[in-house]
């Protein structure tokens, strides 16, 4: 149902993927996730569900942010563990404070907003399961529509289409990988 998933559905040429709507696989309900996995028998889960925009929703509705990005992610991890299925979690470069750019996976995390905190919370549950890959990527649509969104932030936005092309090269990896485009401020 999300922006990235629709690009992935239309542009992906390399991976055999199935897509499930929120109604077909409700990440807020562990039984729903388990049922979806039993029915579809995936070899891996690309977890890109969650709450992202508008950014201020993470301040206005903290409960929704926690439910979708932390608890929902934990439910997906629990289900993956139950069936020994790899999870690839799309996190965000917003887990970093955004002051220097070009962050390494070894740099300390310090989110600058509640969205970053919610993605970091999701990362915590994914990190507990070793059959996993966390991709810290900050994606956006072409053309970039929010040029003045953050004037005091250094980021490495990557376009959805570029990430779709890169994804097949990453699916066998594990751990945490930062992915980004050209540094912008």
Each model region followed by its residue ranges:
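Conserved Rossmann-fold NAD(P)-dependent oxidoreductase catalytic core, especially the SDR/UDP-sugar
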Residues: 74-110
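N-terminal Rossmann NAD(P)H-binding glycine-rich loop of SDR-like oxidoreductase domains
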Residues: 1-14
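NAD(P)-cofactor binding segment of oxidoreductase domains
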Residues: 44, 59-88
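Substrate-positioning beta->alpha
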Residues: 145-175
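Adenosine-cofactor binding site in Rossmann-like domains, unifying the SAM/SAH pocket
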Residues: 13-36
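SDR active-site strand-loop-helix element
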Residues: 20, 45-49, 87-93, 134-137
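Active-site Tyr-X1-5-Lys
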Residues: 110-138
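NAD(P)H-binding glycine-rich loop region in Rossmannoid oxidoreductase-like domains
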Residues: 30-68
